[in-house]
Amino acid sequence: MRTTVILALALLVGLASANLLVNGDFEQTIDVGWDTVAVNFAGGDTFTWSDTLGQPSPGYAVAVRKYLADYASMSQTVGIPNVNLTLTLDGRLEIGGGSSTCWPVAAFVVRYLDSSGVSLGNTKLYLHDQYCDWAVSDTQSLIDVTTPGVWTQFSLDIADELAKSLPGVAAANVKKLTVDLYAYDNGT
């Protein structure tokens, strides 16, 4: 199985449109501002930084790939002034293969954290196969990506998402966000 997350992104604040992410445009190598981790029970992983990934806008993008179990992740945690933020990104998510014992997921995850860094909940924009058993809850929102392999512009209004989709997450307690490019496969 192969899972790929390819993204160019920005986390914007109000009218000023200031990017809160360090190297959010990926104009520098991915070791600037981003943490990468891979857990390999089987298969391998790759993290790619390039200006030739087919992205619709000029500049650089990154690809996170995971082959078989378990996951590869590229993330960044930032303090936020409030939840009146809009996350925008150009993304292309792809998965390959899949079965009831080995199902892949490609996701862009936003984790909502308190001031101590404790997770309060998350939103996942994700591409998955029919065996994926992730479920919506009062602290987890799942947004299906319906354009596999196609560059798509996504936008997530953080305040609106918390109010409408995450009743178990108090917006006033959200002091940090983690953005995570997440490639996952549950089996071998």
Task: Label the model's feature ranges.
Residues 2-8:
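Sec-dependent signal peptide recognition
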Residues 120-170:
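Extracellular carbohydrate recognition and processing domains
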Residues 26, 72-118, 154-160, 179:
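Extra-cytoplasmic beta-strand recognition segments
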